[in-house]
């Protein structure tokens, strides 16, 4: 190996560490500049409470005097929110009506939830049922077509329905004014046994289920 070759090799070896050090320093500076850790101004906002929640729509029915109360949650919880109330008889429950007599029953429906009911309906069952009342029964078979009912919205002073029980059954759902959260609406049911019926209508009963519904 010549003297000049050895000197050149030695020179390269002396500059190699310096080149490596310079490269490492450059990489570090580049990394720092890209990460922004040398930035002097920083601003931030953290929204720690971001929530949304659903309301509840529930119904309460009461008789006159509020001695009997039925709620839509009586059938379980708000997850079910549907109940059957057999303790409020909107046709009065009289078993001794005579021709020409009217029995009136007032009730109230309240929106006990936290949201408004966008629709409010009263839906009769599809069939009015005639049955025997006691052991002495007439032979008539059309009591549902004779007995009448007038349903009045006493809060709005409007007639909801007026006609026979059979007609109510065949008429389908009846739309009622919407109910705000906490609002109470009064209704009355005036059931009449016509004065024109004779002995064949003695000892008979008519029944028809009615369903109140809120929806939002």
Stretches found by the model and what they are:
Residues 2-216:
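Long, small/polar-residue-biased beta-strand-and-loop interaction regions
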């Amino acid at each position: 190996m010549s003297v000049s070759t050895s000197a050149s090799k030695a020179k390269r070896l002396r500059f190699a560490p310096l080149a490596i050090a310079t490269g490492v320093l450059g990489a570090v500076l580049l990394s720092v500049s890209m990460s922004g850790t040398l930035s002097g101004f920083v601003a931030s906002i953290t929204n720690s409470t971001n929530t949304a929640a659903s309301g509840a729509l529930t119904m309460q029915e009461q008789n006159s005097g509020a001695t009997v109360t039925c709620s839509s949650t009586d059938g379980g919880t708000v997850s079910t929110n549907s109940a059957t109330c057999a303790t409020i008889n909107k046709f009065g429950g009289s078993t001794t009506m005579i021709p020409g007599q009217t029995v009136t029953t007032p009730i109230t429906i309240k929106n006990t939830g936290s949201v408004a009911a966008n629709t409010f309906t009263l839906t009769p069952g599809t069939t009015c049922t005639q049955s025997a009342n006691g052991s002495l029964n007439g032979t008539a078979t059309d009591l549902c077509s004779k007995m009448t009912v007038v349903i009045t919205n006493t809060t709005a002073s409007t007639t909801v329905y007026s006609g026979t029980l059979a007609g109510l059954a065949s008429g389908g759902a009846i739309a009622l004014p919407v109910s705000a959260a906490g609002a109470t609406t009064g209704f009355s049911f005036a059931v009449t046994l016509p004065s024109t019926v004779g002995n064949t209508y003695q000892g008979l009963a008519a029944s028809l289920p009615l369903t109140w519904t809120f929806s939002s």
